[in-house]
């Protein structure tokens, strides 16, 4: 396949593009062979259509026009191809030239930032950028046009250093010349005039060189004071206002020289030191004198005590005795006094302890008596309060019984009134058979129900309970003598209505009764507390605390 002539290369393609188009097209390998007789590649069936009469043919003119037309078409194709290739770069040609012309670094930087490549290309671009930065450090320049940080531009730094050294050399030369001129002028005239000195000083002060002017100012103009008066002791101080805000700046205060305290001289300081030494010596002597006096008094006492013993031993000094060196025994009063004082102190302590114990016992008795009295008083108050509560309960029970009796009497009167109204004869009762008998039997007084003994049931609030009696025996006797009869016959067998309305009414009634019962209990408790406060003499609506 490598020997196949149809496989073209890039070089062949470039030759085809750059070479001019020939008059006849190139013969393709896939084209049909031409007819050997006629020399035409068209088939015989189409020849008669393309043949023209010989009288209409102009061989020279036709050939010239055909060549011109093909030439214009080739030029147009070349122009179009060049226009297309103008937008492309021949990188292979540039590589063959080995990159003689370097590209713009700004474009390379922009391309490096805009188009991300692979890791190797990115590393190459970073190395190129570092190399460009290192090269730019040595490009030089001046202070006005440098684009780097001061000190990194090495060539600019060397340039500035050389300029500074050159200026220093010029200053040294100017100083030397000025010194030589001064020496020569002094040697020429031993006593120069004031005008010449003034002119020379003015020339030095107005010199164009900055170094000369600064040296002249330092050497001849500045007179540094030996002692600054402002820094004298107590002359300058800071004034700080503590009452103001913290951010206030302290002000300085300059005192006058007359307001300053005078400094002490060396003689006054020495005199003061001498006075201090004298005073310390005198005080130390006074501090030591009481000890000396005590020692002298002790010696005097010992001498007076030893005098009688020495006089008694004088007559017997002739005889030899083993007790000659011993003194007579003199009892010491000091030990006896201390012993008596100790006894008196111990006796005083014992009496004080006894009195303290007696006071403690008395306080305990008083405290016990106080607590007993308070307990008895509280017990009596509790009994009185209970008695008052029982009296109030009895009175309430009596009032309740009286109200029940009155209510029963009213009911009896109403029943009697109704019976009398029914017993009144209208005059036609005898006409009805059995009318009087039925009427009389229905309203027989013996058959009337006694509702006072009717069993009210568990839901009825009982009028009498345990707390209405003082003792348990009275309540038990009341319960034994109580009669509980069944309810009236008309209360049995009553059919309830359809639906749950009756139940709702009954529940509402039971809730109302329960609330009334609780309210009555609360009122009773409040009445008891109020009565207890009134009986105790407090007069307040509060519960009495228990001890």
UniProtKB/Swiss-Prot annotation:
Sequence repeats lie at residues 336-337, 339-340, 348-349, 350-351, 352-353, 354-355, 356-357, 358-359, 360-361, 362-363, 364-365, 367-368. It comes from the Eukaryota. GO terms for cellular component: nucleolus; nucleus; spliceosomal complex. Residues 66-94, 371-427 form a coiled coil. Residues 336-368 are annotated as: 12 X 2 AA repeats of R-[DS]. Residues 166-178 have a biased composition (Acidic residues). Keywords: Coiled coil, mRNA processing, mRNA splicing, Nucleus, Repeat, Spliceosome. Residues 163-223 are annotated as: Required and sufficient for interaction with smu-1. It is found in: Nucleus. Ubiquitous. Residues 45-58 have a biased composition (Basic residues). GO terms for biological process: embryo development ending in birth or egg hatching; locomotion; mechanosensory behavior; mRNA splicing, via spliceosome; muscle organ morphogenesis; nematode larval development; neuron development; regulation of alternative mRNA splicing, via spliceosome. Probable component of the spliceosome. Heterotetramer with smu-1. The smu-1 homodimer interacts (via the N-terminal region including the LisH and CTLH domains) with smu-2, giving rise to a heterotetramer. Auxiliary spliceosomal protein that regulates selection of alternative splice sites in a small set of target pre-mRNA species. Selectively regulates alternative splicing of unc-52 exon 17. Thus, smu-2 mutants selectively suppress the effects of unc-52 nonsense mutations in exon 17 by promoting the accumulation of unc-52 isoforms that lack exon 17. In contrast, smu-2 mutants do not suppress the effects of an unc-52 mutation that affects the 5' splice site of exon 16. Required for normal accumulation of smu-1. Belongs to the RED family. Intrinsically disordered protein. This is Smu-2 suppressor of mec-8 and unc-52 protein. It comes from Caenorhabditis elegans. The lineage of its organism: Eukaryota, Metazoa, Ecdysozoa, Nematoda, Chromadorea.
């Amino acid at each position: 396949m490598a020997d196949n002539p149809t496989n073209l290369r890039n070089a062949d393609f470039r030759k085809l593009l750059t070479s001019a188009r020939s008059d006849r097209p190139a013969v393709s390998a896939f084209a049909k062979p031409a007819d050997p007789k006629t020399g035409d590649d068209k088939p015989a069936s189409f020849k008669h259509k393309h043949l023209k009469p010989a009288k209409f043919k102009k061989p020279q003119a036709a050939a010239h026009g055909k060549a011109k037309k093909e030439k214009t078409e080739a030029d147009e194709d070349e122009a179009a191809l060049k226009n297309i290739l103008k937008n492309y770069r021949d990188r292979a040609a540039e590589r063959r030239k080995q990159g003689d012309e370097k590209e713009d670094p700004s474009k390379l930087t922009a391309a490096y930032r805009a188009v991300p490549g692979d890791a190797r290309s990115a590393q190459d671009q970073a190395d190129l950028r570092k190399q460009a930065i290192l090269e730019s450090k040595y490009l030089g320049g001046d202070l006005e046009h440098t684009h780097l940080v001061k000190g990194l531009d090495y060539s600019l730094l060397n340039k500035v250093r050389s300029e500074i050294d050159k200026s220093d050399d010029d200053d040294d030369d100017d100083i030397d010349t000025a010194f030589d001129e001064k020496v020569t002028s002094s040697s020429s005239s031993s006593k120069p005039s004031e005008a010449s000195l003034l002119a020379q000083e003015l020339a030095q002060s107005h010199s164009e060189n900055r170094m000369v002017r600064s040296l002249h100012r330092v050497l001849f103009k500045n007179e540094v004071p030996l002692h600054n008066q402002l820094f004298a002791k107590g002359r300058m101080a800071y004034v700080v206002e503590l009452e103001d805000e913290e951010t206030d700046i302290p002000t300085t205060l300059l005192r006058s020289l007359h307001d300053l305290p005078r400094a002490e001289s060396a003689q006054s300081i020495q005199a003061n030191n001498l006075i201090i030494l004298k005073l310390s010596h005198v005080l130390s002597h006074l501090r030591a004198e009481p000890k000396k006096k005590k020692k002298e008094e002790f010696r005097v006492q010992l001498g007076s005590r030893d005098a009688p013993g020495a006089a008694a031993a004088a007559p017997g000094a002739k005889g030899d005795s083993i007790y000659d060196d011993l003194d007579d025994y003199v009892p010491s009063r000091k030990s006896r006094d201390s012993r008596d004082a100790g006894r008196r102190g111990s006796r005083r302590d014992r009496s004080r302890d006894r009195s303290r114990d007696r006071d403690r016992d008395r306080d305990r008795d008083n405290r016990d008596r106080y607590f007993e009295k308070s307990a008895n008083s509280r017990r009596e108050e509790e009994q009185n309060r209970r008695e008052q509560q029982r009296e109030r309960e009895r009175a309430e029970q009596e009032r309740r019984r009286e109200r029940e009796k009155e209510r029963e009497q009213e009911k009896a009167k109403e029943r009697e009134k109704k019976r009398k109204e029914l017993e009144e004869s209208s005059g036609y009762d005898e006409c009805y058979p059995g009318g009087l008998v039925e009427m009389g039997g229905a309203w027989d007084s013996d058959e009337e129900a006694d509702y006072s003994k009717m069993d009210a049931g568990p839901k009825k609030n009982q009028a009498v309970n345990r707390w209405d009696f003082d003792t348990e025996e009275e309540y038990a006797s009341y319960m034994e003598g109580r009669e509980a009869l069944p309810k009236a016959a008309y209360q049995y067998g009553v059919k309830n209505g359809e639906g749950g309305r009756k139940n709702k009414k009954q529940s509402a009634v039971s809730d109302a009764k329960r609330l009334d019962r609780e309210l009555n209990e609360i009122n009773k408790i409040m009445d008891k507390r109020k009565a207890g406060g009134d009986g105790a003499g407090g007069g307040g609506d509060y519960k009495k605390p228990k001890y």
